[in-house]
């Protein structure tokens, strides 16, 4: 008997599903893998029998297991189960959403938030900087990008922004349309303040000496708003 990799996978899934069913019958609470295998194997068998539609199996898949049939936390881990099943008229994807109803118990890793506003970057001193996009394309800056090194077509006092980032929620951004001018709030970058990457204007500890070097580099490379002493010469030792 020669089986394709897909057929071998289905055979393994059937075996896992049967094992899970037997354990369920013995009153053993199922883990994540066993729960998914039981639901998937049942759907495959019913689809092969050809007496139920894909829509019917989607609904039936939600009735196979109850919260008491699985270990604590498993129900909340399974948001959906998708299985490609063979029906008489061909292969169809059967997706069962929320296959196990919530038990009402605490979920591992669950967070309980206070019903009040959260103050971001509390206690950090912010500075306001006016920025203008003198380029012909929109520029979007992420919350933790070193603002000193943003797109060269943004014109602002770069020296004032050295070692700082946007004072906005993590993962959000500020967008500047072509020709747009607006003020943004900036705060100091935290941690060890070793700044690497971005536009490679710093690549070292963010201190007063590295600021002079970064301003010199920015001016040489055409970053708007970068002003440095033309007589300043510094040999960078790598």
Curated annotation (Swiss-Prot):
One of its GO terms (cellular component) is urease complex. Pathway: Nitrogen metabolism; urea degradation; CO(2) and NH(3) from urea (urease route): step 1/1. Its main location: cytoplasm. InterPro entries: Urease_beta-like, Urease_betasu_sf, Urease_gamma-beta_su, Urease_gamma/gamma-beta_su, Urease_gamma_sf, Urease_subunit. Its EC number is 3.5.1.5. Keywords: Cytoplasm, Hydrolase. It is an enzyme of class 3 (hydrolase). One of its GO terms (biological process) is urea catabolic process. The keyword Hydrolase applies. It is found in: Cytoplasm. Gene3D superfamilies: Urease, beta subunit (2.10.150.10), Urease, gamma-like subunit (3.30.280.10). Residues 103-238 are annotated as: Urease beta. Pfam families: Urease_beta, Urease_gamma. Residues 1-102 are annotated as: Urease gamma. It catalyses: urea + 2 H2O + H(+) = hydrogencarbonate + 2 NH4(+). One of its GO terms (molecular function) is urease activity. NCBIfam families: PRK13192.1 (NF009671), PRK13203.1 (NF009682), PRK13241.1 (NF009712), PRK13986.1 (NF010592), urease_beta (TIGR00192), urease_gam (TIGR00193). In the N-terminal section; belongs to the urease gamma subunit family. Heterohexamer of 3 UreA (alpha) and 3 UreB (beta) subunits. This is Urease subunit alpha.
């Amino acid at each position: 008997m020669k089986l394709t990799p897909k057929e071998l996978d289905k055979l393994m899934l059937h075996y896992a599903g049967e094992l899970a069913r037997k354990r369920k019958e013995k009153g053993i609470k199922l883990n994540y893998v066993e729960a998914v295998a039981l639901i998937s194997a049942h759907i495959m068998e019913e689809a092969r029998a050809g007496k139920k539609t894909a829509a019917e199996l989607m609904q039936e898949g939600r009735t196979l297991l109850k919260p008491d049939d699985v270990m604590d936390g498993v129900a909340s881990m399974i948001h959906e189960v998708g299985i490609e099943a063979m029906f008489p008229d061909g292969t169809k994807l059967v997706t069962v959403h929320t296959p196990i109803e919530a038990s009402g118990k605490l979920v591992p890793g669950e967070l309980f938030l206070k019903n009040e506003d959260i103050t971001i970057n509390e206690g950090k001193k912010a500075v306001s900087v006016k920025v203008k996009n003198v380029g012909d394309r929109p520029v979007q800056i992420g919350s933790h990008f070193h603002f000193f090194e943003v797109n060269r077509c943004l014109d602002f006092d770069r020296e004032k922004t050295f070692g700082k980032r946007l004072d906005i929620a993590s993962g959000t951004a500020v967008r500047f349309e072509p020709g747009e001018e607006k003020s943004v709030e900036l705060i100091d970058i935290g941690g060890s303040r070793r700044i690497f990457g971005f536009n490679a204007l710093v690549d070292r500890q963010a201190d007063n000496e590295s600021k002079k070097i970064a301003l010199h580099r920015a001016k040489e490379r055409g970053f708007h708003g970068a002003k440095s002493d033309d007589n300043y010469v510094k040999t960078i030792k790598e």
